[in-house]
């Protein structure tokens, strides 16, 4: 008996054929359903509006991504190298890839999530501290045990008495040390019990960078670094360093978060200033100086989101808020937002702080000031770690930093879309902090698929003390998320520009600018127009530089 062909067998059994009208109707319905689902994605409209050159560039980037992933998988003997752990990546090798070159060259708009203490290279900061005259150190207790060295408070402060004879004064490593007394930096370093100055530098560096398996980076690093940034010469040097690095990464505007819990001192002054208005003055001076340089051309500016630790007492929080209002009054162009940050496990929740936050808003209104809320919320996956999302939305936050648990709340997802709230997301940093296992377990792809507006930021330096720039965040997103391409990155850059606080705006004007986007007439519209012009030039470069990839067949 002759074997039947597949088609003959199917006809004999009465199996419908693909060309049958009702099967074709099913396929049309299927295609419509897929298209309808894709309309929910964050980059749907941008994908449809891409000019031909940009569409070609997107196709080339996707091919290069797939080729390099295939090569990496083969070399590592893996089925899929899409999800390497950030801490184990050979970044030197990554930076030699075509995909890295492309992402590095991409214009990146604004950086909206940027803790100032995490933006500074650890080795640079330590060198500046050692070369600044009069620097002293102090601790709240003697630092004797390894636990003391790892966790206890340690800070810097200028003192004109640092050069005087203090040979008999116990250092912080001695049980005889008097808590909070100042010890000259070089004396403390040379007497460090684990290797003198070299060991001290290594220890100090370890306090300034994330450590594998430990999620307490900000608790350890933020107070230490901010104590250094509270002295004028070091603040100026670090701002120059950070502005230059950001501009070289394709960033044209930044909003730093920083805390103001240490008294600020001018150069050579033992007595601190009242408040932090002079800090803001230095910030504006250094920004203007950088913008006047050749490398600062095209840098739109920088502003500050005043970050208040939730661990402070409510009375101290109110005093911190008063300091913020005064600084905003004196230097309105510097302060653009207010955040309540998580710095310890035992702290006030946003719910606990609602009365104080209403008081803050009333005081701002009375002074004619506009300081928008940009809250950390939903950044912990532990039970109860998502409750701040409800408060952030109800309090009218324009942006939410974190949002790791947002995807678990369908109603909040819809509210955030309706109220046009941006989520500031830092997948690589979240992995560094131990909040997620990697890009494959990060909620970013889910948020994007549901049409939530997201921008990428950076929340921690790398393990070697170098700041994690946006290029790394972009590279991880495009190589680690299957549905992410150049269009997805471009949409997140557009979001970063649309949600930038270039200038103070009342709510109605803010929402109007968000709705109008590139078609508006204000600052944001012009910045979007400039970015799209830069993006088209970038896409043209991609099509010319990697033209051979366009005609290659996928393996």
What are these regions (language model features)?
Residues 2-422, 426-555:
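Metal-cofactor-binding active-site regions of metalloenzymes
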């Amino acid at each position: 008996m002759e074997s039947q062909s597949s088609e003959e067998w199917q006809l004999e059994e009465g199996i419908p054929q693909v060309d049958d009208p009702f099967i074709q109707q099913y396929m049309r319905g299927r295609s419509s359903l897929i298209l309808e689902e894709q309309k929910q994605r964050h980059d749907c409209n941008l994908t449809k509006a891409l000019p031909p050159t940009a569409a070609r560039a997107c196709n080339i980037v996707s091919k290069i991504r797939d080729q390099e992933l295939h090569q990496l998988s083969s070399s590592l003997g893996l089925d899929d190298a899409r999800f390497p752990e950030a801490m184990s990546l050979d970044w030197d090798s990554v930076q030699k890839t075509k995909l890295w070159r492309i992402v590095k060259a991409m214009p990146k708009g604004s950086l909206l999530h940027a803790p100032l203490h995490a933006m500074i290279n650890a080795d640079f900061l330590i060198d500046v501290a050692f070369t600044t005259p009069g620097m002293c150190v102090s601790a709240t207790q003697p630092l004797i045990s390894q636990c003391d060295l790892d966790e206890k408070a340690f800070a810097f402060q200028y003192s004109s008495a640092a050069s005087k004879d203090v040979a008999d004064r116990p250092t912080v490593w001695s049980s005889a040390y008097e808590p909070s007394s100042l010890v000259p930096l070089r004396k403390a370093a040379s007497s460090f019990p684990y290797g003198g100055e070299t060991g001290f530098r290594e220890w100090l560096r370890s306090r300034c960078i994330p450590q594998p398996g430990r999620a307490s980076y900000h608790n350890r690093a933020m107070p230490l670094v901010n104590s250094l940034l509270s002295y004028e010469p070091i603040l100026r040097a670090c701002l120059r360093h950070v502005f230059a690095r950001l501009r070289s990464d394709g960033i044209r505007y930044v909003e730093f978060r920083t805390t103001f819990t240490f008294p600020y001192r001018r150069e050579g002054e033992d007595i601190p200033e009242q408040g932090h208005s002079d800090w803001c003055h230095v910030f504006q001076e250094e920004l203007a100086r950088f913008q006047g340089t050749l490398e600062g051309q095209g840098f739109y500016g920088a502003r500050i989101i005043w970050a208040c630790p939730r661990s402070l007492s409510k009375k101290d929080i109110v005093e911190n808020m008063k300091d913020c209002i005064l600084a905003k009054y004196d230097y309105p162009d510097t302060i653009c937002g207010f955040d309540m940050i998580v710095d310890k496990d035992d702290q006030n929740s946003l719910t606990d702080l609602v009365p104080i936050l209403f008081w803050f808003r009333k005081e701002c209104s009375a002074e004619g000031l506009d300081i928008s809320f940009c809250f950390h919320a939903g950044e912990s996956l532990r039970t109860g770690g998502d409750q701040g999302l409800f408060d952030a939305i109800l309090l009218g936050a324009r942006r939410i930093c974190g949002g790791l648990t947002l995807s678990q709340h369908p109603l909040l997802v819809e509210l955030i879309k309706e109220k046009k709230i941006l989520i500031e997301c830092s997948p690589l940093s979240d992995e560094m902090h131990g909040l997620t296992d990697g890009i494959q377990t990060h909620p970013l792809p889910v948020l994007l698929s549901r049409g939530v507006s997201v921008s990428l930021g950076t929340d921690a330096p790398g393990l070697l003390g170098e700041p994690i720039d946006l290029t790394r965040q972009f590279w991880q997103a495009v190589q680690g998320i299957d549905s992410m391409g150049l269009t997805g990155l471009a949409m997140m850059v557009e979001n970063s520009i649309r949600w930038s606080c270039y200038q103070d705006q009342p709510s109605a004007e803010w929402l109007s600018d968000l709705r109008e986007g590139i078609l508006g007439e204000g600052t944001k519209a012009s910045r979007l127009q400039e970015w799209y012009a830069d993006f088209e030039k970038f896409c043209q470069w991609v099509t010319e530089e990697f033209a051979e990839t366009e005609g290659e067949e996928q393996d």
